[in-house]
Amino acid sequence: MARRPRAPAASGEEFSFVSPLVKYLLFFFNMLFWVISMVMVAVGVYARLMKHAEAALACLAVDPAILLIVVGVLMFLLTFCGCIGSLRENICLLQTFSLCLTAVFLLQLAAGILGFVFSDKARGKVSEIINNAIVHYRDDLDLQNLIDFGQKKFSCCGGISYKDWSQNMYFNCSEDNPSRERCSVPYSCCLPTPDQAVINTMCGQGMQAFDYLEASKVIYTNGCIDKLVNWIHSNLFLLGGVALGLAIPQLVGILLSQILVNQIKDQIKLQLYNQQHRADPWY
């Protein structure tokens, strides 16, 4: 009676440990963020090119466009490893993707924990960033719009108080300051007037020369740091939800990549096993 020794081997070769669901789910997951990263880089580069070179170089460290480009490039490289690694079933790229994503997640977690544990130092760092932004207020249009939005949103002016605007060369109160905005504050510090159809951009003229009581009739006198801290304390659940929303995609990416890596390793072992037993007529 004729034997069919190679039928099980053929059956074994048709079987694969690699799940198409996991493979393509990870691929499309990375593809989505890959596209988002390219949009971020494109927007950042466009915003950068639209600025004057001198103004852009003056405040490179606080330029939102630079931050957008850096985050976009890092996300692009990370998701590129995930896309190609999952599509080509490349263990090296998948491990790189998983390790980098784990490092990003741990850094975010550590930053959040340290921010709560060392709240005073975090507050000092925020104060330093805000003061640096005030200094470069007129140098960068994006930064200027961001500060104006923040002061309107939180009903505040400056870092600690409205007099922090004296750090800016245009708003400085020194007698030798030739600027027309000397001792003033930006219009975003002004109290809203419901019946005013057109925004008065000169409403903050000379406000730093007044004391708190007099200035409070026209502008916000409280600093943005205290307002920001109070807002954070009042919206902890919202911030927790945002943090969770950022963490879940990262954890999903780490989990899927590790599952796929283990499946690829099992598939490699199966292929090696089949190759070693092909010479066996009873296999």
Curated annotation (Swiss-Prot):
Assembly and binders: Homodimer; disulfide-linked. Interacts (via extracellular domain) with ADAM10 (via extracellular domain). Interacts (via cytoplasmic domain) with PLEKHA7 (via WW domains); the interaction is dependent on PDZD11 being bound to PLEKHA7 and facilitates the docking of ADAM10 to zonula adherens.
The principal localisation class reads membrane
State the tissue distribution.
Answer: Predominantly expressed in erythroblasts.
**Species lineage:** Eukaryota, Metazoa, Chordata, Craniata, Vertebrata
According to its UniProt entry, the protein's GO biological process terms are: pore complex assembly; protein localization to plasma membrane; protein maturation
Whose protein is this, by species? Homo sapiens
Glycosylated sites: 172
Keywords, alphabetical: Cell junction, Cell membrane, Cytoplasm, Disulfide bond, Glycoprotein, Membrane, Transmembrane, Transmembrane helix
- Stated family: Belongs to the tetraspanin (TM4SF) family.
Intracellular or extracellular location(s): Cell membrane; Cell junction, Adherens junction; Cytoplasm
Read off the SUPFAM superfamilies from this record: Tetraspanin
The record places the following residue ranges in the Cytoplasmic compartment, namely 1-24, 86-96, 257-283
Q: PANTHER family this protein is in?
A: TETRASPANIN (PTHR19282), TETRASPANIN-33 (PTHR19282:SF154)
Residues on the Extracellular side? 46-64, 118-235
Q: Check the record and name the CDD domains matching this protein.
A: penumbra_like_LEL (cd03158)
Q: What does this protein do?
A: Part of TspanC8 subgroup, composed of 6 members that interact with the transmembrane metalloprotease ADAM10. This interaction is required for ADAM10 exit from the endoplasmic reticulum and for enzymatic maturation and trafficking to the cell surface as well as substrate specificity. Different TspanC8/ADAM10 complexes have distinct substrates. Plays an important role in normal erythropoiesis. It has a role in the differentiation of erythroid progenitors. Negatively regulates ligand-induced Notch activity probably by regulating ADAM10 activity.
Indicate yes or no for the key word Magnesium.
no
Q: Does the keyword DNA repair apply?
A: no
Got any disulfides in this one, which pairs? 156-224, 157-189, 173-183, 190-203
Q: For this UniProt entry, what's an example GO CC term?
A: cell surface
State any single GO MF term: enzyme binding
The record describes its membrane topology as:
Multi-pass membrane protein
List the protein's name. Tetraspanin-33
Q: Entry's InterPro entries? A: Tetraspanin/Peripherin, Tetraspanin_animals, Tetraspanin_EC2_sf
Instruction: List the transmembrane segments.
Output: 25-45, 65-85, 97-117, 236-256
